[in-house]
Amino acid sequence: MDENKKRALAAALGQIEKQFGKGAVMRMGDHERQAIPAISTGSLGLDIALGIGGLPKGRIVEIYGPESSGKTTLTLSTIAEAQKQGATCAFVDAEHALDPDYAAKLGVNVDDLLVSQPDTGEQALEITDMLVRSNAVDVIIVDSVAALVPKAEIEGEMGDQHVGLQARLMSQALRKITGNIKNANCLVIFINQIRMKIGVMFGNPETTTGGNALKFYASVRLDIRRTGAVKESDEVIGSETRVKVVKNKVAPPFRQAEFQILYGKGIYRNGEIIDLGVQLGLLEKSGAWYSYQGSKIGQGKANAAKFLEDNPEVAAAVEKSIRDQLLAAPASARPAALADEPADADLDY
């Protein structure tokens, strides 16, 4: 850059700083770049699929899927992991359906959890904004977008038409709180439901509620689905779950993770550690026996998982090795369970 341009730029920057305050415009090379801080989801496979070890702080995340697919379980698991790091968490329960006993079973410290059950969508989003601006809350869950009913709809008659009210409410709220979320370094997770578009002949007829604004403002969008049942003898004790990362602004998208959610217990984390440990050679499997560093730890996956539960230091060591290998690995080096989805899959999402 020649001298005249340098002087002109310096004058412009000085004027901007004088008018808008120091830091209004910065040169990126003047400050050391730092990795985006993340909060674990409670699922090792999903943390790796997200590319940074969890959900990004200072960003908006959307988690959507059909009923009983594990959306609330995943968010409560995220709260439990955040609380282990000393984070303050809030749950905006617009559906009025939060079960404290179930949350406690997943490891959530319900005594320290902030809970709000707002009457209207406007109230829910205003509470969310105020919590963000306090700079004292690290994780906020909004459950769910579909339950954020505008005040005009609540006060109106049952059959009244209110076209686009919820979409306008979400658009206005997200414009307002996005900057505050970044400044507060707060993770805000919106749970959303799926609806069917009428008259779609080709492509995916599924869409999410609340208009398009959340799709744009969200840095990460997760599609969670129940793919099967986990059985013990003839009794169903959980569900097989698949999560696709359909949008990711902080790492490559279209990755997916598969794990089990056990009823009353949550995400089967030790099962993930065993599966990924075997695929990476950190654990050895010979017939039905699993071994770690030459010592047998159990016959069958359930017994091996029990060993890891009784020996958390071994589980932590294996998990750390898995994270160290996979979070720095290219896509070609990842196990099949964490493979990328085709780039053209689910474009409608």
UniProtKB/Swiss-Prot annotation:
Binding-site residues, ATP: G65, P66, E67, S68, S69, G70, K71, T72
GO cellular component, one term: cytosol
Keyword Chaperone in annotation: no
Family matches, as SUPFAM superfamilies: P-loop containing nucleoside triphosphate hydrolases (SSF52540), RecA protein, C-terminal domain (SSF54752)
Any one biological process term the GO annotation gives: DNA repair
MF terms (GO), sorted A to Z: ATP binding; ATP hydrolysis activity; ATP-dependent DNA damage sensor activity; damaged DNA binding; single-stranded DNA binding
Location relative to the cell: Cytoplasm
Top-rank lineage group of the source organism: Bacteria
Covalent S-S links between cysteines: none
Signal peptide stretch: none
Keywords from the UniProt entry: ATP-binding, Cytoplasm, DNA damage, DNA recombination, DNA repair, DNA-binding, Nucleotide-binding, SOS response
Principal cellular location given in the protein's record: cytoplasm
Similarity comment: Belongs to the RecA family.
Job description of the protein: Can catalyze the hydrolysis of ATP in the presence of single-stranded DNA, the ATP-dependent uptake of single-stranded DNA by duplex DNA, and the ATP-dependent hybridization of homologous single-stranded DNAs. It interacts with LexA causing its activation and leading to its autocatalytic cleavage.
NCBIfam families assigned to the protein according to its UniProt record, in alphabetical order: tigrfam_recA (TIGR02012)
Name of the featured protein: Protein RecA
Organism: Azotobacter vinelandii (strain DJ / ATCC BAA-1303)
Gene: recA
